[in-house]
Amino acid sequence: MDEVLSFKRGRVPLLISMPHPGTRLTPAVDAGLVEEARALTDTDWHIPRLYDFAEELGASTLAAHYSRYVVDLNRPSDDKPLYSTATTGLYPDTLFDGRPLYREGMAPSAEERMRYLAEVWTPYHRTIAEELARLKAEFGYALLWDAHSIRSHVPHLFDGRLPDFNLGTNAGASCDPALAARLEAVCAAAEGYSHVLNGRFKGGHITRHYGQPEQHVHAVQLELAQCTYMDEQAPFAYRADLAEATRAVIRELLESLLAWGRERYA
């Protein structure tokens, strides 16, 4: 398969993971998609662009190239459900709105999907694990920020309009509570934006698996409402007029994350 990810090593103890901005499809997935799925509506559009200041902060960055329709990097390899409510699995068969992803009988075979696990999912998670280990060895701790976005209205997944900033810490298990409180305070002070901590999106597999505060690895997921930086309808254009202020809040969140780490591990 083609190159499956982009990784850039930084100089501070922070890794920003971007598992869902990819738009590449495998031939088997491409051949089977229903017409309405071809717009790749459920993509976390423009996330690398939204976070392109990460290099200035010194953060390491990791971004996936393949679409979540191929394999969802934020699900466990055994596909154990993460939420009791409606969700999508390791190998999605439905769109976020509940409609089928594939034409009847056209989903990739089990053998094909095992290849996606080996060639797309595994390298991404190997990179996370290796980089967190490197950061912890160098600094004594590591910080993981899992960057996501989603349409602000998806009735099949949640009621009403999603808050703008959705912080997830696996109900407090993936990071120090003092860190979560500091990040929530940043969101609360961000004029014109709504937020929630551990609401509908508490953190997917990446946050839950790698966040081990007792081992000095602190993980936080941000699920961002896409209306804060882009058009939510095709062709899903990036809106610099909206994104500028949103990026400023994200940057403040990441700077606060780094500052907390310096203070906690001084």
From Swiss-Prot:
E.C. number: 3.5.1.68
Similarity comment: family membership: Belongs to the N-formylglutamate deformylase family.
Cited Pfam families: FGase
The protein, known as: N-formylglutamate deformylase
Keywords carried by this UniProt record: Histidine metabolism, Hydrolase
Catalytic activity: N-formyl-L-glutamate + H2O = formate + L-glutamate
Note: There appear to be two competing pathways for the degradation of N-formimino-L-glutamate in P.aeruginosa: the two-step degradation of N-formimino-L-glutamate to ammonia, formate and L-glutamate (via HutF and HutG), and the direct hydrolysis of the formimino functional group of N-formimino-L-glutamate to produce formamide and L-glutamate (via PA3175).
Physiological role: Catalyzes the hydrolysis of N-formyl-L-glutamate to formate and L-glutamate. Shows weak activity with N-formyl-L-glutamine.
GO MF annotation, one: N-formylglutamate deformylase activity
Keyword Hydrolase listed: yes
GO biological process: L-histidine catabolic process; L-histidine catabolic process to glutamate and formamide; L-histidine catabolic process to glutamate and formate
Pathway participation: Amino-acid degradation; L-histidine degradation into L-glutamate; L-glutamate from N-formimidoyl-L-glutamate (deiminase route): step 2/2
Lineage: superkingdom: Bacteria
Claim: Hydrolase is one of the keywords in the record: yes
Enzyme class, spelled out: hydrolase
Assembly description: Monomer.
SUPFAM superfamilies tied to this protein: Zn-dependent exopeptidases (SSF53187)
Species the sequence originates in: Pseudomonas aeruginosa (strain ATCC 15692 / DSM 22644 / CIP 104116 / JCM 14847 / LMG 12228 / 1C / PRS 101 / PAO1)
